Amino acid sequence: MKEYLDLCQLVLEKGHLKNDRTGTGTISYFGYQTRYDLQKGFPLLTTKKVHLHSIIHELLWFIRGETNIQSLVKNDVRIWNEWPYQKYCKSNYYQNETMEEFVEKIKNDDEFAKAYGDLGPVYGKQWRSFLGSDGKVVDQLQKVMEEINCNPNSRRLIVNAWHPAYIKEMALPPCHLLFQFYVNENRLSCLLYQRSADIFLGVPFNIASYALLTMMMAKVCNLEVGNFVHTIGDAHIYLNHIEQIKKQLSRTPRMLPKMIIHGNQQSIFDFKYEDFELQDYIPYPAIKGKVAV
């Protein structure tokens, strides 16, 4: 996707060297927006192979309101493993287990998973069970789906994952923290605000995930898809990802694939992994990079 490569090029050319929480170091650029027309194809990077399996399972995990990684690791999704493992390594119960041994325990031992696999009140918790100051719990995803159906012209079609009172309890505060739907001419668009964006590892997942969420919501609300608008605060390339980014910039983007959603779902909560079929995806080979924790 040219839009993604333009972001990469801009950050390399105009970004600033900046220290970060992980100690890795970044080239950072503040304030950027990209628009993807979902009528033109599914925005999954072709300049490297992206693991759609993980994207779909993670999105369904968010939608179910889950915060424990057990169901992810049972489906061979590894993207959240580092954070609970890092926390476990600092506990009194750590017995020099490797990451692989830790993940096997999470997968097969429900009590261990309950104790060490939870990420705190992260995305799914806030989407489905946002706790108000009055003690009332709000299912934001349910409410926004109902509002799209009942009042599509509303300017309040918002889901917010940023809960200041619980930030310290989260393994990682939400990076993609707020999204808003917009209906015009029977088409559903989505705007995401992302406070922090790891351009090499995170952004390709974020684009595809929210594009897919928009398609799913449009389907159950009997709408066509419009645009996915991606607004980023701190857009950064980690210093240990620069060569990987340059490799992508040397590759010519290919035609976007198509995403087919099978089934007759009536609610955003009805989707299953098997409902999704990606067609005509011809990416370049995958490029590896280490996640900064």
Label each residue range with its predicted role.
Residues 1-293:
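Terminal, non-catalytic protein-protein interaction segments that mediate quaternary/complex assembly
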